[in-house]
Amino acid sequence: MSVLVYFSSSSENTHRFVKKLCIPAKRIPLIDKKEFQIKSPYILVIPSYNNGILDTAVPHQVTNFLNTLHNKFFLKGVIGSGNKNFGVNFCIAGNIISKKYKVPLLYKFELLGTNKDVINVKNGINKFWKKLNLEKKNQNA
């Protein structure tokens, strides 16, 4: 089964958004206690931090998570969240992950997201997995 994996700080903005999706999701721990490993394809939901400053926009917990071979391998897409006050760096962490790991940036939303964002993300995720599964079938044919 495909899931969402997400990181949320103590503000819980991303957590609250992901809960509204009603999709199976696993949270990257705030405190790196032990290796957190995903063993199936997933989409990463990631907020941008530190006013979108490039060097620190991706939380270190996410960097550590993606430095694990399994986690890197199963990453299939990314959804970014952020604050529009960051200007051109709005959702920059999603852009960074998308480029670095060569996965599509599927959607961007601000802070807690709107009801429209929830609908768009749910529909987009369903379409994305269907497309990915179809491509996989065609490769195996």
From Swiss-Prot:
Entry GO MF terms: FMN binding
InterPro entries: Flavoprotein-like_sf, RNR_Ib_NrdI_bac, RNR_NrdI
Pfam families: Flavodoxin_NdrI
GO annotation, biological process: protein modification process
Disulfide bonds: none
Entry-linked SUPFAM superfamilies: Flavoproteins (SSF52218)
Signal peptide annotation: none
HAMAP family named in the record: NrdI (MF_00128)
Classification via NCBIfam families: nrdI
PANTHER family recorded: PROTEIN NRDI
Function field: Probably involved in ribonucleotide reductase function.
Family: Belongs to the NrdI family.
Record-given protein name: Protein NrdI
Organism whose genome encodes this protein: Wigglesworthia glossinidia brevipalpis
